[in-house]
Amino acid sequence: MKTSLFKSLYFQVLTAIAIGILLGHYYPELGAQMKPLGDAFVKLIKMVIAPVIFCTVVTGIAGMESMKAVGRTGAVALLYFEIVSTIALIIGLIIVNVVQPGSGMNVDPATLDAKAVAIYAEQAKDQGIVGFLMDIIPGSVIGAFASGNILQVLLFAVMFGFALHRLGSKGQLIFNVIESFSQVIFGIINMIMRLAPIGAFGAMAFTIGKYGVGTLVQLGQLIVCFYITCILFVVVVLGSIARAAGFSIFKFIRYIREELLIVLGTSSSESVLPRMLDKMEKLGCRKSVVGLVIPTGYSFNLDGTSIYLTMAAVFIAQATNSHMDIFHQVTLLVVLLLSSKGAAGVTGSGFIVLAATISAVGHLPVAGLALILGIDRFMSEARALTNLVGNGVATVVVAKWVKELDHKKLDDVLNNRAPDGKTHELSS
């Protein structure tokens, strides 16, 4: 049945974002005070992410007939992530070299306020590849759930799912309990999502109120260049991948439009992770595939963040007249292939990884980060939106690759067809 426009989450979030922009622009002090509304919504979502991932992965793996299928899915997913994220890095590098948004700024690094980025540089020290891999192993199971570390929870869930599968019929009771618990958690998520318009309003009002539209003008060329690059990446690269997998990228974007609007308001793709797990399963992807690909993609398949990292690093070089030849840019690319895997789908993580990369490369002035500190928040929306679409496409592609995709269901859902073959509006 067709949902009333005013009752649809899509309309409510879009309206809330518009009101937030107006409030932040005309009453900046009041707008800046709306920050707790956005923070509270994101915290509520984070509260249920760990149990959702655990339940989805455990029931998905334990319910599979063969454990080899799980290993094959994981290997295919990691291969896909590496290829596509590398393409994203290269595209960002090419575009920023062609457009050269930082050229002519002639900024002296000595005049920049290094203190403004000191906290990010300090956090970046822990972003080494060894530290990242060690951090995947939790100090305790309770600690993994308490901290909400996605990869730690995922590791424990995979091990738990394998162990439960080996129990066979003896583990059926535990399996049923976890599946029932999963339904309760998704019920909580439905309640939280009713607050999405309030969260989007608060986050957007704060952003405009604190940083102002004027901030966009000074470094607008980089922002415009980045947004256009992200759009081209989604339409051309992800669009081509989607076409090869047998579906339209535009129909897929329409299918996840509510999630995209929530991400637009909160600047965090993590805010819709629970909903994406549910929607990708409804799209025809097997639960075990969704449970592995989506959470893992939040650290290993951040296409938008990859584009941002190469563009921002070269922009700083251009603005500060720090010469970067082919050797330096290839070195930057290699470092980013590793450091970009440590970025999570939360606001601010991309900037921390950028600080880590610039420190590792050594050729660029760390103080140059101050140039984009003020506008980083405005670019986080494009990063998060691209990351979300990228992970959704990855799930369908991996499911198709390992033959765990219901093609008829995918076609019916994306074309708004009911099981009876009739075409009408389906609730999303």
Swiss-Prot record:
Q: Spell out the molecular function terms from Gene Ontology.
A: fumarate transmembrane transporter activity; malate:proton symporter activity; succinate transmembrane transporter activity
In Pfam terms, one family for this protein is SDF
Top-level taxon of the source organism: Bacteria
Q: Which GO terms describe its biological process?
A: L-aspartate transmembrane transport
InterPro entries with a match to the protein in the record: C4_dicarb_transport, Na-dicarboxylate_symporter, Na-dicarboxylate_symporter_CS, Na:dicarbo_symporter_sf
Any transmembrane segments, and where? Answer: 4-24, 44-64, 76-96, 142-162, 184-204, 222-242, 289-309, 326-346, 352-372
The record's annotation in Gene3D superfamilies points to: Sodium:dicarboxylate symporter
Q: Which GO terms describe its cellular component?
A: plasma membrane
Q: What is this protein called?
A: C4-dicarboxylate transport protein
- The gene name reads dctA
